[in-house]
């Protein structure tokens, strides 16, 4: 049986036993802060077992995708460690118990999987003789039953439900280990007796102090590893040698001269074992990365995003060890991974995220090599590399420790391991004491802060003169600094990233020098920490000024989120819950559960409702009240009540007569200031969860519609060309020929009309521009053509970008409209991906913006070195 057949067989079997089949849920937990990832089949059903929610049935079964990264170093080394896996489960909540669970298990392994009865073994808790006798009643011999102790066969985690468990093992034979049943009896790790199914009998309630009372409602919780079952049925030495992994491994082989050899499990060639491990690590890690990104997570320096970044970078390094020189490369594995699993998502979007992360890491590799080469050239007589610098390379730059070691060994230089471990321990200790939301990296010096000291005044004020209470770099508190600093002020108007709203931007000024606010986040006490770069002294006050345009954008989209949430509940019912939101100055996203994807008609209803709220011109109120009062006015509790330190002083954002929401963000004074509202997309984020993206304000929506129009025109041009090139060369019967001929002629007529309309539109746009297209000269940079003009008016920059792009489709067109503090800039091309160009240059210049493949627009502070960079350092990629 292949993996797809086994998964289907499990679900079909339990459906035939009247189990409700629970669809696989997102890897990202919903309203469960105790989990970083969904890590088991039962993790998505916790609310049913706790009684918080009513289950759809007393009997349930699933095949749940899961992530565990606590044993990442074992992946690729052992036969069965994975970061991503599927857990098959069957569950009973107050329904059947031991007898039925054991009968179902017996029937499935013998009649469905067709496993050899004589090769099955079962462990059970030594006091649980009922379970032992139930296995015997199924025809198994006593010598196939192994008693276990509390450590091996009693499931208990602190207080709460607990009970004995029984495990099913399969003996794969002497070729995997000549030692016999003693392996299982003594709980020795081995590759012969493989656990395939664990059945937990939730029987008692523990008080955590060794006292147990029997539960009124007894439950069954089981887990069977799909990868393990597949390896047994396919007689594969390891899980990696099955149809779940081999297609991915074979795809990797296309890019390297090295080969993965299954037979090496038995031959045990040391060099080949190492090579095999590289293939396994890449295949495993990229399964995790692809599925996590598909469920809505993205690589970053925080939380789940940090894990994805680490897995991608670890895979990237293993690709280097396989001498894979084509970079980026990992993103090319997305399609084969998707084909091996039953989950639906946009593989192109997932690949784009991975590719972007690979490009970013390739720059990190270059930076790390520069630092190492500099040390080697300046310290040619030294044979020991500072361990703290090696750790900084790893932690700050993400440069793999193994690569540092490899490069240095070529020069007979060793790393001071003692210093490395000390630096690592120091970092871990600081991380343990910090849980700041919105932090872009670990800042050890924040451990020096011991209490809440600041005051947020940003609801009432957007500027202030403030005193610096703490001036920090990453390690220490300072009296002055010239570089990256983290400030805590006595009072601040800057909102910190929280509640789905991005932080304020703006500047602080000291002694006539303005420093841009790069980030604002809260430490564990709730102090606002401001990140800036430049010269500062703790001895002088600072003038704070919030960027009012960005603040207004944030307010629009946060208020727009509340109004859209209200509209969604009006259209779909009060069962709609907010599962997540993200608001910045440009757009908003909102995650909510739906039975099926909302239709265009339903989305239009939501959009029109929000527009009606705008037209009502309703004032916003901030109300402070207790939780009971909040419930009386039907305030929507979009945040967990427990997150509020004082439930008697909840902050309610009230648009009277429309919606009242528990919220700590900044909002518009009146709904009319939203101006306009448009939902731009609805996409599936996970099973039963959809992400809605929307924008607000007339200017933003006009820009969006213009971009859409430009894209549509390009699509039409391509379609026209394709239709004109079509050869209608086929035979038809006489009766059909007249009708077909008429239809073909109609298509041709419409094509010609569309073609003329597009040409006229381009001609019309061309008349509006202020330069002569025939006088444009392209610059040749190593076979790549560039047109850069910084004397364009802001009003015509967008129109002109499109016209020049059509005239010179193989060139990169960069137009700039000069400004005092910053300049407007556009990138347009049919050959080069415009938004990727913008993103790449943003890594080297103070540049921000957005767009699409054929047109991207933004703003840039200093572009004086832009052309030089494009000539000397930029990697031109189609």
Swiss-Prot record:
Binds 1 zinc ion per subunit. Signal peptide: none annotated. InterPro entries: aa-tRNA-synth_II/BPL/LPL (IPR045864), Ala-tRNA-lgiase_IIc (IPR002318), Ala-tRNA-ligase_IIc_anticod-bd (IPR018162), Ala-tRNA-synth_IIc_core (IPR018165), Ala-tRNA-synth_IIc_N (IPR018164), Ala-tRNA_ligase (IPR050058), Ala_tRNA_ligase_euk/bac (IPR023033), DHHA1_dom (IPR003156). It catalyses: tRNA(Ala) + L-alanine + ATP = L-alanyl-tRNA(Ala) + AMP + diphosphate. The gene is alaS. Keywords: Aminoacyl-tRNA synthetase, ATP-binding, Cytoplasm, Ligase, Metal-binding, Nucleotide-binding, Protein biosynthesis, RNA-binding, tRNA-binding, Zinc. This is Alanine--tRNA ligase. GO terms for cellular component: cytosol. Consists of three domains; the N-terminal catalytic domain, the editing domain and the C-terminal C-Ala domain. The editing domain removes incorrectly charged amino acids, while the C-Ala domain, along with tRNA(Ala), serves as a bridge to cooperatively bring together the editing and aminoacylation centers thus stimulating deacylation of misacylated tRNAs.
């Amino acid at each position: 049986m292949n993996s797809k057949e086994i998964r289907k067989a499990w679900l079909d079997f339990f459906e035939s036993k009247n189990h409700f089949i629970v669809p696989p849920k997102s890897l990202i937990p919903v309203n469960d802060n105790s989990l970083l990832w969904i890590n088991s089949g039962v993790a998505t059903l916790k609310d049913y077992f706790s009684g918080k929610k009513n289950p759809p049935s007393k009997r349930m079964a699933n095949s749940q995708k899961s992530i565990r990264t606590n044993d990442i170093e074992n992946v690729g080394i052992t036969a069965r460690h994975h970061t991503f896996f599927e857990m098959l489960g069957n569950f009973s909540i107050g329904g059947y118990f031991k007898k039925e669970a054991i009968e179902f298990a017996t029937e499935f392994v013998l009649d469905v999987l067709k496993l050899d009865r004589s090769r099955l073994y079962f462990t059970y808790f030594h006091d649980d003789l009922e379970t032992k006798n139930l296995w015997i009643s199924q025809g198994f011999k006593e010598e196939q039953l192994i008693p276990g102790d509390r450590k091996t066969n009693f499931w208990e985690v602190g207080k709460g439900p607990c009970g004995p468990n029984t495990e099913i093992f399969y003996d794969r034979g002497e070729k995997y280990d000549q030692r016999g049943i003693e392996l299982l009896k003594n709980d020795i790790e081995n590759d012969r007796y493989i656990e395939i199914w664990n059945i937990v009998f939730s029987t008692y309630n523990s008080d955590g102090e060794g006292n147990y009372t029997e539960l009124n409602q007894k439950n069954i919780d089981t887990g069977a590893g799909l990868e393990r079952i597949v390896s047994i049925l396919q007689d594969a030495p390891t899980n990696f040698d099955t149809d779940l992994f081999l297609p991915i491994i074979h795809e990797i082989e296309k890019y390297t001269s090295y080969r993965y050899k299954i037979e090496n499990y038995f031959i045990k060639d040391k060099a080949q074992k190492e090579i095999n491990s590289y293939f396994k690590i890449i295949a495993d890690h990229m399964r995790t990365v692809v599925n996590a990104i598909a469920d809505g997570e993205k690589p970053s320096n925080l939380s789940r995003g940090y894990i994805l970044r680490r897995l991608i970078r670890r895979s990237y390094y293993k690709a280097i060890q396989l001498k894979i020189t084509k970079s980026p490369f990992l993103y090319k594995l997305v399609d084969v991974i998707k084909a091996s699993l039953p989950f639906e998502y946009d593989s192109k979007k997932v690949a784009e995220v991975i590719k972007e992360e690979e490009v970013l890491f390739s720059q990190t590799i270059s930076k790390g090599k520069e630092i190492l080469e500099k040390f080697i050239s300046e310290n040619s007589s030294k044979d020991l590399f500072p361990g703290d610098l090696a750790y900084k390379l790893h932690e700050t730059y993400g440069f793999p420790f193994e690569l540092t070691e490899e490069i240095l060994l070529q020069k007979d230089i060793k790393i001071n391991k003692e210093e490395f471990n000390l630096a690592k321990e120091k970092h871990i200790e600081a991380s343990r004491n910090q849980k700041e939301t919105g932090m872009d990296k670990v800042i050890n010096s924040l451990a020096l802060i011991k209490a809440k000291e600041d005051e947020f005044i940003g609801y009432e004020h957007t500027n202030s003169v403030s005193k610096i209470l703490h001036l920090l770099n990453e390690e220490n508190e300072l009296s002055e600094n010239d570089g990256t600093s983290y400030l805590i002020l006595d009072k601040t108007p800057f909102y910190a990233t929280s509640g789905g709203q991005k932080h304020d931007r703006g500047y602080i000024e000291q002694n006539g020098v303005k420093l841009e606010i790069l980030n604002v986040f809260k430490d564990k006490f709730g102090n606002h920490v401001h990140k800036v770069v430049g010269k500062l002294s703790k001895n002088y006050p600072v003038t704070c000024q919030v960027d009012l345009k960005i603040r207004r954008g944030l307010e629009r989209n946060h208020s727009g989120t509340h109004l859209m949430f209200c509209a969604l509940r009006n259209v779909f019912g009060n069962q709609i819950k907010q599962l997540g939101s993200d608001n910045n100055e440009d757009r908003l996203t909102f995650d909510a559960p739906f039975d099926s994807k909302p239709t265009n008609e339903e989305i239009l209803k939501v959009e029109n409702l929000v527009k009606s709220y705008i037209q009502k011109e309703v004032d916003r109120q901030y109300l402070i009240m207790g939780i009971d009062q909040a419930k009386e006015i039907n305030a929507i509790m979009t945040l967990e009540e427990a997150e509020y330190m004082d439930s008697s002083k909840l902050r309610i954002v009230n648009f009277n007569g429309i919606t009242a929401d528990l919220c700590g963000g900044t909002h518009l004074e009146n709904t009319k200031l939203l101006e306009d509202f448009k939902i731009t997309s609805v996409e599936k984020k996970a099973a039963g969860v959809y992400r809605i993206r929307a924008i607000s304000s007339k200017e933003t929506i006009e820009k969006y519609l213009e971009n859409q129009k430009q894209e549509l025109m390009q699509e039409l041009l391509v379609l026209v060309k394709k239709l004109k090139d079509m050869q209608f060369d086929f035979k038809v019967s006489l009766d059909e020929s007249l009708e077909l001929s008429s239809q073909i002629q109609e298509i041709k007529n419409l094509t010609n009309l569309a073609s003329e309309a597009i040409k006229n539109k381009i001609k019309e746009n061309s008349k509006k521009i202020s330069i002569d297209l025939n006088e444009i000269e392209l610059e040749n940079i190593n076979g790549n053509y560039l047109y850069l003009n910084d004397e364009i008016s802001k009003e015509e920059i967008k129109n002109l970008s499109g016209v020049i792009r059509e005239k010179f489709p193989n060139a990169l067109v960069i137009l700039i409209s000069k400004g005092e503090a910053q300049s407007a800039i556009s990138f347009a091309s049919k050959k080069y991906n415009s938004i990727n160009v913008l993103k790449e240059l943003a890594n080297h210049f103070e540049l921000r913006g957005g767009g699409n493949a054929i047109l991207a627009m933004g703003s840039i502070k200093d572009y004086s070195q832009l052309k030089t960079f494009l000539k000397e350092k930029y990697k031109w990629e189609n």
